[in-house]
C-alpha cells in the first residue's frame, strides 16, 4: 500500500476536497512544490495556478486556485485558497475572454500599478486555461 497523508482544500465558499492522497503538486510563491508523505513542515503562499492531487488509489484531480496559503504538518496538508474551482467547472470561453481583456489592459496600461493588476489578471486567466486543458486531457 502506498504511503499517504490527509489533504484538505478549502476556499472561502466551500470545502473542495478532503481525503487521503499520495501526493500533491502546487504553485508556491517560490516555485512549484511537490508534497509527498513525511514532507518537512512548511507554510507558504500559493500563486494562481492549479493543485494536482494524486488520490489514495492513484486517481488524479486538478483544481484551479486563485491564490492562498499551503500548510504542511506531519500527516496532514491544508490548502486555504482565496478561490478554488474544479477543472470540470471552469468555463473555457470566459477564461479566454478574461485573458484577452487582461492582455488588452496590459497593452494600454499607464503606470506600474495598472500593469501589475493586468499582469495578475493575465496570470489567473492563463492558469484557468491550463487547468481546463489538463482536465480535458484526463477525460
Swiss-Prot record:
<dbReference type="GO" id="GO:0005886">
    <property type="term" value="C:plasma membrane"/>
</dbReference>
<dbReference type="InterPro" id="IPR001469">
    <property type="entry name" value="ATP_synth_F1_dsu/esu"/>
</dbReference>
<keyword id="KW-0997">Cell inner membrane</keyword>
<dbReference type="Pfam" id="PF02823">
    <property type="entry name" value="ATP-synt_DE_N"/>
</dbReference>
<keyword id="KW-1003">Cell membrane</keyword>
<comment type="subunit">
    <text>F-type ATPases have 2 components, CF(1) - the catalytic core - and CF(0) - the membrane proton channel. CF(1) has five subunits: alpha(3), beta(3), gamma(1), delta(1), epsilon(1). CF(0) has three main subunits: a, b and c.</text>
</comment>
<keyword id="KW-0375">Hydrogen ion transport</keyword>
<keyword id="KW-0813">Transport</keyword>
<keyword id="KW-0406">Ion transport</keyword>
<dbReference type="GO" id="GO:0005524">
    <property type="term" value="F:ATP binding"/>
</dbReference>
<dbReference type="GO" id="GO:0045259">
    <property type="term" value="C:proton-transporting ATP synthase complex"/>
</dbReference>
<comment type="function">
    <text>Produces ATP from ADP in the presence of a proton gradient across the membrane.</text>
</comment>
<dbReference type="InterPro" id="IPR036771">
    <property type="entry name" value="ATPsynth_dsu/esu_N"/>
</dbReference>
<comment type="similarity">
    <text>Belongs to the ATPase epsilon chain family.</text>
</comment>
<dbReference type="InterPro" id="IPR036794">
    <property type="entry name" value="ATP_F1_dsu/esu_C_sf"/>
</dbReference>
<dbReference type="InterPro" id="IPR020546">
    <property type="entry name" value="ATP_synth_F1_dsu/esu_N"/>
</dbReference>
<dbReference type="InterPro" id="IPR020547">
    <property type="entry name" value="ATP_synth_F1_esu_C"/>
</dbReference>
<dbReference type="GO" id="GO:0046933">
    <property type="term" value="F:proton-transporting ATP synthase activity, rotational mechanism"/>
</dbReference>
<keyword id="KW-0472">Membrane</keyword>
<dbReference type="Pfam" id="PF00401">
    <property type="entry name" value="ATP-synt_DE"/>
</dbReference>
<keyword id="KW-0066">ATP synthesis</keyword>
<keyword id="KW-0139">CF(1)</keyword>
<protein>
    <recommendedName>
        <fullName>ATP synthase epsilon chain</fullName>
    </recommendedName>
</protein>
Amino acid at each position: 500500500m502506498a504511503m499517504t497523508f490527509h489533504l484538505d482544500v478549502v476556499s472561502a465558499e466551500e470545502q473542495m476536497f478532503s481525503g487521503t492522497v499520495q501526493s500533491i503538486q502546487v504553485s508556491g510563491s517560490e516555485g512549484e512544490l511537490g508534497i509527498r508523505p513525511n514532507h518537512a513542515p512548511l507554510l507558504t503562499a500559493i500563486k494562481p495556478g492549479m493543485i494536482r492531487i494524486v488520490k489514495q488509489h492513484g486517481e488524479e484531480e486538478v483544481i484551479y486556485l486563485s491564490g492562498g496559503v499551503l500548510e504542511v504538518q506531519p500527516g496532514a496538508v491544508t490548502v486555504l485558497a482565496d478561490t478554488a474551482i474544479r477543472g470540470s467547472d471552469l468555463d473555457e470561453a470566459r477564461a479566454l475572454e478574461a485573458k484577452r481583456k487582461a492582455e488588452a489592459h496590459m497593452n494600454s496600461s499607464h503606470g506600474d500599478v495598472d500593469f501589475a493588476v493586468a499582469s495578475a489578471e493575465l496570470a489567473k486567466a492563463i492558469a484557468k486555461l491550463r487547468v481546463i486543458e489538463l482536465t480535458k486531457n484526463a477525460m
